[in-house]
Amino acid sequence: MQKPWVEKYRPETLSEVVGHHEIIKRLTNYVEKKSMPHLLFSGSPGVGKTTAALALAKDLYGDTWRENFLELNSSDERGIDVIRTKVKDFARTKPIGDAPFKVIFLDESDALTSDAQNALRRTMEKYSDICRFILSCNYPSKIIPPIQSRCAIFRFSPLKTEDLVENLKDISEKENLNLEKGGIDAIIYVSEGDMRKAINVLQTAAAVSDEITEEIVYKVASKARPDEIKKMTQLALNGKFVEAREQLYNLMIDWGMSGEDILIQVFREVPNLDISEKEKVHLVEAIGECDFRIVEGSNERIQLSALLAKMGILE
């Protein structure tokens, strides 16, 4: 069975990691000196936090990386018992081979409960001579200050377009795909700097055809073309509510889009609309209200229709 491409093409070493050049430079320095503090990786999903941690371990330990590296997902195992058992048991044993210390990687550590984080802080202190921790999170504000102060913090930003393009072209070449310019642009649009999402969309599109076109990408990603969203919003802004609502229903039915997905794309189009700054402010406010109501459980079609109606009377 074929591996997911995100795993098949995951970088094995720090030198292979795409983007984040300054971060990779500092991590490589830790490997060369065989010395590092506890680390905190923060950033949105799919930007390379886990990949960087795995590559660091492989560069640091070589063939014994599996024995000296423990990876846990804190969103699945978020209670204090995990810290007291799995983490503590691994942290207090000596490293294998000539490794200076072991590494424990806690993915999505912002999901740890407050009690678990306090227990983790004590474990970090107690075993700091033979163990280092790498914490990965989406929201660093959810990590308690005593842990943050013990870590060197690395902020992973969304990947740049050129980094995404380079990697997508490389994978396409290895998989014998014809990645068209429109297909690349579409993947860049739907992934928003998320390399994992970009590769997953590419693999899904490749299951449909070896010719990766704009149309296929938007279809498999269940996203509308930006011009489809712009057409709908422009109709609404021009007071053509019925036509705008018809376009909305087409997006929801033909493209299988959720109300939340459509709302996010409308929000992304706001800066490009030919309306005044004041009208853009009022529109963003209306989008925020619509988003809140949908999250609270209101009917998506009714709320999005109400948003389109408001667009026609913006002041």
Swiss-Prot record:
Residues annotated as binding ATP are: G43, S44, P45, G46, V47, G48, K49, T50
User: Which terms in the Gene Ontology molecular function aspect does this entry carry?
Assistant: ATP binding; ATP hydrolysis activity; DNA binding; DNA clamp loader activity
Q: Name one Pfam family in it.
A: Rep_fac_C
Q: Which GO terms describe its biological process?
A: DNA repair; DNA-templated DNA replication
This protein's record includes keyword Ligase:
no
Q: Which UniProt keywords apply?
A: ATP-binding, DNA replication, Nucleotide-binding
Keyword Cytoplasm among UniProt keywords: no
Q: From what superkingdom does this record's organism come?
A: Archaea
The record's Gene Ontology cellular component field reads: DNA replication factor C complex
InterPro entries documented for this protein: AAA+_ATPase (IPR003593), ATPase_AAA_core (IPR003959), DNA_pol3_clamp-load_cplx_C (IPR008921), DNA_Rep/Repair_Clamp_Loader (IPR050238), P-loop_NTPase (IPR027417), Rep_factor-C_ssu_arc (IPR023748), Rep_factorC_C (IPR013748), RFC_lid (IPR047854)
Similarity-based family: Belongs to the activator 1 small subunits family. RfcS subfamily.
Q: Which PANTHER family match?
A: REPLICATION FACTOR C / DNA POLYMERASE III GAMMA-TAU SUBUNIT, REPLICATION FACTOR C SUBUNIT 4
What is the role of the protein in this entry?
Part of the RFC clamp loader complex which loads the PCNA sliding clamp onto DNA.
The annotated subunit structure for this chain is: Heteromultimer composed of small subunits (RfcS) and large subunits (RfcL).
The record's annotation in HAMAP family points to: RfcS
**Which NCBIfam families does the record associate with it?**
PRK00440.1
Q: What is this protein called?
A: Replication factor C small subunit
Q: Origin organism of this chain?
A: Methanococcus maripaludis (strain DSM 14266 / JCM 13030 / NBRC 101832 / S2 / LL)
